[in-house]
Amino acid sequence: MRPALFLCALLMPVALLGGCRQQGDWQHLEGVALDTGYHITLNGDLQAAERDLLMAAIQGELASLETESETLRGLLLAGWPTRDAAQLPFLASLLEALRGAEQARAVDRLDAVLAEFGIDHAMVELGGVVRTRGQAGRRPWRLALDRSGLDDAPAPPLRLRDAALVTREQPGDAVMPDGGGERLLAVSVVADTAEQADRRARELLLAGPSAADMEQAIRLVVLRPQGIDIQYGTALEPLLER
């Protein structure tokens, strides 16, 4: 059994930090964790007691993740000559990447909690990281891709089922590199889990657009001398709502 379920009784008061709304057969759970908000939409016939138990399990899982995060950050900062990350750009960037990875891990672990409660249709979002379970009614979940520095032109939404979506952006302003060339501004990745999508997105940001395998379920936002170019991987095309 997962630690969150053991902590349910102890952490029931913590559930008050979150919220729950119901619209027909849909339940909406929300709260704050890991420096951001989370939103869970699920389709399940939950009674009030079951809903409270689920909220307690979610808060227990998030409390465990917060503890793990604090421990890891403490160990990381202890190895540096100063704890002022603002004076160390590399450390600040590392901590930001760590937080993104933690948020992706949290989404996967919340999805696992929903699975333990027998919930087959749900969507979890935390810090912009999304994972879907089953469908939204009779259709896959419908998600909007992050604009990531683009203009106001509409982008085709995604239809996802049992998959995760992560979008990561390059830090800094959208400027051309010295000598021209191209720069990858942002990448969106669809994968089976949020951690897989997050890891792949960060690998692509480091490697650049020329190293991308365009047969995968990815979207690249590339800055070129001629302007911004949007590239969709072939595995992503069937998921786009045209």
Predicted regions mapped to residue ranges:
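Mature catalytic core of soluble alpha/beta enzymes
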Residues: R2-R242
